[in-house]
């Protein structure tokens, strides 16, 4: 039998005082199974369960670029029994992108940042695309025709490529899919030639990394240039974090944050996240809340400047 650590046991005792003995914590992942966020959730779930001292059960609620599952959290009771593990799109982008968003980013209660990696522009090795210059040249030959995939309308892949298109004054054809899992499969089948998504897909599927939307080159792809090296101020991190329902008592949020910190320090989680290509980056609840505000403001400006907001 595996015993709880002293720290985890302390959290379990505190949690027991504020939740029914039979309570489970439901972890909503607002994306289909098999995508990057789902992989992270299944890597951390066993250790997070131990750290919380109560069973954490994953439930995938995909659709509408993550907003269906996120809206479910916003409507949840503030009793600590529902949390959300999500990548950034439904939090930092969709409330500014949608004509009638079902929630505001500031309604969610930030718990912790779990992982962060640079968005990576990738393509199969058979397309002949090697550089950003290759993409620009093709787009200029047939304006509006060159397709690219994304994990959904208004997702980071969509916004990143919008920023790239604006920087070079080109038009491309956006083909949205239901999460990164579906979009990479479409690319592998030849439906679309490129995708901007999490970097781990490059090694997983033997793809070519064209560029990273980051301040510095990735240690995993030291030969791949950043957009900044090409004179473009396009820095778009792909981050994943945990949130809980609006109005959840601070004591509960603090305990979730403590459990998150311990989970991300656990050797098996570090090993699994590294192997899966999802670099851990922990921010506590206060730091993460400030980070989310800054990210939401950044993407709100890009959406305004690009005229991307959905019409009523």
Spans of model-derived segments:
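Mature extracytoplasmic/periplasmic domains
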Residues: 265, 270-289
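Stable alpha-helical elements in mature extracytoplasmic
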Residues: 36, 40, 44, 65, ...
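Short alpha-helical functional segments enriched in proximate histidine and acidic residues
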Residues: 51, 263, 295, 302
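Bacterial N-terminal signal peptides
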Residues: 7-18
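Hinge/capping helix and adjacent helix->loop/strand transition within the periplasmic-binding protein
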Residues: 25, 48, 75-81, 88, ...
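N-terminal (or domain-start) structured segment
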Residues: 20-107, 145, 153, 168-205, ...
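Positively charged n-region of N-terminal signal peptides that target proteins for export
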Residues: 1-6
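Short beta-strand->loop
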Residues: 103-113, 171-175, 199-202, 206-235, ...
């Amino acid at each position: 039998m595996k015993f709880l650590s002293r720290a985890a046991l302390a959290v379990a005792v505190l949690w027991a005082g504020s939740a029914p003995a039979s309570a489970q914590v439901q972890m909503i992942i607002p994306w289909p199974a098999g995508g990057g966020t789902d992989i992270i959730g299944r890597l951390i779930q066993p250790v997070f369960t131990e750290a919380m001292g109560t069973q954490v059960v994953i439930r995938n609620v995909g659709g509408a670029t993550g907003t269906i599952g996120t809206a479910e959290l916003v409507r949840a009771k503030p009793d600590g029994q529902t949390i959300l593990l999500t990548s950034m799109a439904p939090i930092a982008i969709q409330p500014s992108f949608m004509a009638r968003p079902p929630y505001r980013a500031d309604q969610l209660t930030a718990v912790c940042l779990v992982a962060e990696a640079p968005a990576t522009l990738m393509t199969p090795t058979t397309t002949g695309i090697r550089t950003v210059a290759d993409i620009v040249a093709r787009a200029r030959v047939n304006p509006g025709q060159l397709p690219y995939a994304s994990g959904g309308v208004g997702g980071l892949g969509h916004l990143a490529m919008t920023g790239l298109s604006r920087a070079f004054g080109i038009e491309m054809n956006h083909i949205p899919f239901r999460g990164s899992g579906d979009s990479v499969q479409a690319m592998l089948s030849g439906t679309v030639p490129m995708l901007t998504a999490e970097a781990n897909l490059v090694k997983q599927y033997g793809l070519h990394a064209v560029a990273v939307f980051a301040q510095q080159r990735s240690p995993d792809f030291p030969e791949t240039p950043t957009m900044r090296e090409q004179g473009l101020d396009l820095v778009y991190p792909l981050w994943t974090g945990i949130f809980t329902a609006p109005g959840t008592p601070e004591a509960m949020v603090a305990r979730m944050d403590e459990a998150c910190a311990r989970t991300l320090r656990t050797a098996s989680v570090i090993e699994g996240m590294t192997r899966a290509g999802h670099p851990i980056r922990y921010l506590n609840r206060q730091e993460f809340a400030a980070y989310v505000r800054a990210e939401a403001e950044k993407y709100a400006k890009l959406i305004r400047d690009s005229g991307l907001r959905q019409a009523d």
